[in-house]
Amino acid sequence: MRDDRALNVTSEIGRLKTVLLHRPGEEIENLTPDLLDRLLFDDIPYLKVAREEHDAFAQTLREAGVEVLYLEVLAAEAIETSDEVKQQFISEFIDEAGVESERLKEALIEYFNSFSDNKAMVDKMMAGVRKEELKDYHRESLYDQVNNVYPFVCDPMPNLYFTRDPFATIGHGITLNHMRTDTRNRETIFAKYIFRHHPRFEGKDIPFWFNRNDKTSLEGGDELILSKEILAVGISQRTDSASVEKLAKKLLYYPDTSFKTVLAFKIPVSRAFMHLDTVFTQVDYDKFTVHPGIVGPLEVYALTKDPENDGQLLVTEEVDTLENILKKYLDRDIKLIKCGGGDEIIAAREQWNDGSNTLAIAPGEVIVYSRNYVTNEILEKEGIKLHVIPSSELSRGRGGPRCMSMPLIREDL
């Protein structure tokens, strides 16, 4: 790894050096039962405890020598580079919030510019803006009066603490993702401004393997780096096959790339199998946690450069078990550790609470949720070192330690 790289991730298990998190904010307290479906939540976490749990997560990372960065802080610092950038950010944020009324747009621009501190402004954008907070706004237009019942001008963004999905670090570049739903696609604006304008990343020659303006969807939970040569991507409830092809073309044909193969895993389209990383994560060189429902046989498509057609892909279908596919492409024996030990009831319960969603901070060393005690005991018996974090409230969002983190730098294996 070059020391001047702003980003470097070539595996799932290389020692973690720098990670991006988002500490849950007031957006959680703007959730109501009526908004759960709209905002893609199943329950309402208790913010005070969720923050305590998240702080324990961050402290665990720091104690392991990991530099912890926060999305909200980097976003605020990125727009401090110039007033032009800040105004562009505000305008784009309002447009993507779906604000139709011109009078309302003007009121929001004035409101956001009233914050003397950019961090406070970003926090408010993430939390959501209620109509009653715009003190000088009067509901005079037909649009505003007809839409008077809904309380928010800008919806809260409660999924932000799952920083894995809006973008993903691959090699020394990123996929700036187009999320499946409008609710979550708004989240990617923060990464856009961070990687284009923050002093830490600006001018660092960071390639974008995928862009948020693409029309098909791609989410970071479906992107797993199996080695410096092999990227796995799930074709799932949230990621389209067309997106996998776009990503593969850019990644495999980039002049400085180490990647040679993209493996597209077709997984069941359901809430429990939302992303590839909800059913399958790497914990050591040869060990993976899996949901029993993903062991296969699976449909997997190997995408490689077409030697006879420059710029095109060769797509090879393989139908085999997960173990055999991993063994073939990683060239080693593989141990699959089943969530819940394979017990049907325990596996379903612990899978619902992300028992298969671990974050490796080094080979054979992972962070896990305390509530998945059966899976955790099995991992320990397999020689995996565990860092167990509290999870009663964080887990209500249906994401585990991997979902809540975006590695920016890992040591190469």
Curated annotation (Swiss-Prot):
List of catalytic residues: C403 (amidino-cysteine intermediate)
GO BP annotations, alphabetical order: arginine catabolic process to ornithine; arginine deiminase pathway
Domain of life where this protein originates: Bacteria
Keywords on record: Arginine metabolism, Cytoplasm, Hydrolase
The EC number(s) this enzyme carries: 3.5.3.6
Any Pfam family the entry gives: ADI
Pathway it works in: Amino-acid degradation; L-arginine degradation via ADI pathway; carbamoyl phosphate from L-arginine: step 1/2
NCBIfam families xref list: arcA, PRK01388.1
Catalytic activity: L-arginine + H2O = L-citrulline + NH4(+)
SUPFAM superfamilies per UniProt: Pentein
CC terms in the record's Gene Ontology section: cytoplasm
Class of the enzyme per the UniProt entry, highest EC level: hydrolase
GO molecular-function terms, A-Z: arginine deiminase activity
Name of the molecule in the record: Arginine deiminase
